């Protein structure tokens, strides 16, 4: 029986671009069928960091932004602001290309599962305060994602690998279970195409809308 990689028809693009701001530093890259032509990073998560990294990416390259014919956008999880800025950047590329660019979207948890050779059953990442994303399922595939309370996620999936985030969690994670999120560990388009889906517009990953508790305070009467 053929494996999953051999049964999927690989798109043939001349100059694909990967835009991934799910972690710090942000990463942009030009993937090849197996591996990467080039990857650039930038510690600044704001729009200027994305432009700076992309500009460096295309230095001394035969093509430029106008030659891009595919974009792989990481929808998260990550900083909501950073993901929205990256989405705006990708939308600008799509608008200027006038239909010439194919858009694909992937989840960082799925791509992270391609970054290790270990046999894993789950990967976790920070969500909002007190909650965590948990991805389960096969590697090199689009897995199932759930949002669990932090204590439940850590108790039910004690062997998870973990992506780090800006917030600290209640317990210390063993160093051996921390997974470095690095595009260099991904086998280019071979892995990207297994975890990506086509999209019309980039949309940041947001499984739960933010909720705000109704204020029930009392305004003191004026004297």
Tell what function each PLM region has:
Residues 54, 89-93, 113:
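Buried hydrophobic packing segments
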Residues 62-65, 94-105:
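Phosphate-handling active-site elements
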Residues 1-33, 45-52, 103-223:
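Oxyanion-binding and handling regions
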Residues 30-31, 37, 41, 63-66, ...:
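Recognition helices and adjacent regulatory flanks at domain boundaries
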Residues 70-100:
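DPxDG-like acidic metal-binding loop motif
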Residues 37-44, 74-80, 175:
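A short glycine/serine-rich beta->alpha loop
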């Amino acid at each position: 029986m053929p494996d999953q990689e051999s049964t999927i028809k690989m798109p043939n693009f001349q100059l694909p671009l990967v835009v991934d701001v799910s972690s710090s530093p942000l990463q942009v890259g030009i993937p090849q069928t197996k591996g990467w032509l080039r990857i650039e990073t930038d510690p600044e998560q704001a729009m200027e960091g994305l432009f700076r990294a992309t500009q460096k990416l295309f230095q001394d390259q035969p093509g430029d932004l106008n030659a891009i014919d595919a974009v792989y956008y990481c929808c998260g999880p990550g900083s909501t602001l950073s993901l929205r800025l990256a989405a705006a950047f990708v939308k600008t590329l799509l608008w200027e290309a006038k239909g010439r660019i194919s858009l694909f979207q992937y989840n960082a948890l799925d791509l992270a599962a391609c970054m290790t050779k270990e046999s894993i059953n789950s990967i976790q990442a920070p969500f909002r305060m007190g909650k965590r994303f948990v991805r389960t399922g096969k590697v090199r595939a689009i897995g199932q994602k759930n949002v669990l309370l932090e204590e439940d996620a850590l108790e039910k999936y004690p062997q998870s690998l973990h992506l780090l985030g800006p917030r600290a969690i209640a317990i210390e994670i063993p160093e051996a279970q921390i997974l470095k999120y690095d595009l260099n560990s991904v086998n280019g388009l071979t892995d990207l195409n297994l975890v990506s889906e086509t999209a019309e517009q980039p949309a940041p990953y947001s499984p739960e809308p933010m909720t705000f508790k109704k204020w029930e305070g009392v305004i003191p009467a004026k004297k």
